[in-house]
From Swiss-Prot:
Function: May be involved in lipid homeostasis.
Gene Ontology biological-process entries: Golgi organization; protein secretion
Pathological association: Metabolic crises, recurrent, with rhabdomyolysis, cardiac arrhythmias, and neurodegeneration: An autosomal recessive disorder characterized by metabolic encephalomyopathic crises, hypoglycemia, hyperammonemia, episodic rhabdomyolysis, susceptibility to life-threatening cardiac tachyarrhythmias, developmental delay, intellectual disability, and mild diffuse cerebral atrophy.
Impact upon substituting T236I: In MECRCN; uncertain significance
The UniProt record lists the keyword Hydrolase: no
Keyword terms of this UniProt record: Cytoplasm, Disease variant, Golgi apparatus, Mitochondrion, Neurodegeneration
Protein name: Transport and Golgi organization protein 2 homolog
Native organism: Homo sapiens (Human)
UniProt record similarity statement: Belongs to the Tango2 family.
Amino acid sequence: MCIIFFKFDPRPVSKNAYRLILAANRDEFYSRPSKLADFWGNNNEILSGLDMEEGKEGGTWLGISTRGKLAALTNYLQPQLDWQARGRGELVTHFLTTDVDSLSYLKKVSMEGHLYNGFNLIAADLSTAKGDVICYYGNRGEPDPIVLTPGTYGLSNALLETPWRKLCFGKQLFLEAVERSQALPKDVLIASLLDVLNNEEAQLPDPAIEDQGGEYVQPMLSKYAAVCVRCPGYGTRTNTIILVDADGHVTFTERSMMDKDLSHWETRTYEFTLQS
């Protein structure tokens, strides 16, 4: 289970406003090996964490490049998985390394969507000169990707804006933090968004999660139904905040669990300006 909240306004009126505010949780088995967010050794334009699971090495769930390409992935909750399907993390990696625009890329992905287990993919081209474009495709929804209009969105392990109770609850908390964003110092805004991502209040009952997840989700429903998931050996292990201001200055903050220890976390921040 993962969750993403984001607000984008390609041309904010105020100089103090942000073009993009994104807050995301990665929920995964604590034992699954991965690298913390960093610029890639073989491509120092791209910043992301990396999956190091055998056979899935190099995939990722969220990343951004200095050229303004951004992508984020969530899995679609389904009771049965096809273990022969392609690894979904490659969808983000491929976009970050290609020169293809976000909509064209998602159109190509949509032609191959049947080769993967369920997923949702956000792809964006952030350009100070041309204006920002953010697109969405889910392979369990409509056949064609869509270009998103400016606004605030929530995405978990169903289709975009599916009203799971935890998504609605978290989105409201996110909106409250975002509404104060212009008046807050950047570090205070980041701290407020991290508080949103670490809210463990279960939003029950939620028939929508039960219906979609079936028997698979029943034993863990009370844990899955919170923005921040806490189960034995599985749960929220990475929080990521991405801010892009009116001038194209990016602040990328990642807070990650270390050594499978809930009491041990590391926070790292990267800042750069998008290539126009």
